[in-house]
Amino acid sequence: DRKAKARFLSKGGDPKQFTYQYPYSIGSLEKLEQNVQGLGSISFLDQLDGIIRSLPLIVQFDKKLYPTMGLEMVRVGAKQKNVYMELNDVGIKRISTRPYKINSDPNGIIWIKYKKSQKKQYISAGDVYDGNFEKSFFENKYVLIGASAQGLFDLVKTPLGVTIPGVEVH
């Protein structure tokens, strides 16, 4: 039974009325899930044109709330246990984990502010494994590990007219 690592607190209503619900979930290896500080969803919302412009910060599966990967990284990096949601009559107004406050749409969705992809931000897994990198490369940074091979089907279109690895969206 998968359980979110974040604790959700809300003021002004029940966020489950407004968050996107998914019918099923595919988790990581149980051993990994049990030994990490955070678990985040990596789901995208379907778009008619296939371009990813927005991302939910909180999703729902099996009547339980889960943060998306980006929000969970912020929470864990800030050494917080809680995610707070402020709601009004129309839905979610703000999502926060101290000291960060993020305004969202009523469904907890934010618009992604893309920037031009910078290859210098990448390092191959092979180089890490072989120790062929500057140790300072990872210092004081959030690190995402992902695959970018076309056959893995984790490439997404952005409003900038480019296709990027899905991990870069987070």
Where are these predicted regions, by residue range?
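Non-transmembrane functional regions of envelope-associated proteins
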Residues: 1-100, 138-170
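Active-site Gly/Thr loop motif
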Residues: 103-123
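Short gly/ser/thr-rich secondary-structure transition/capping motifs
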Residues: 124-129
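Short amphipathic alpha-helices and their capping/turn segments at secondary-structure boundaries
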Residues: 130-139
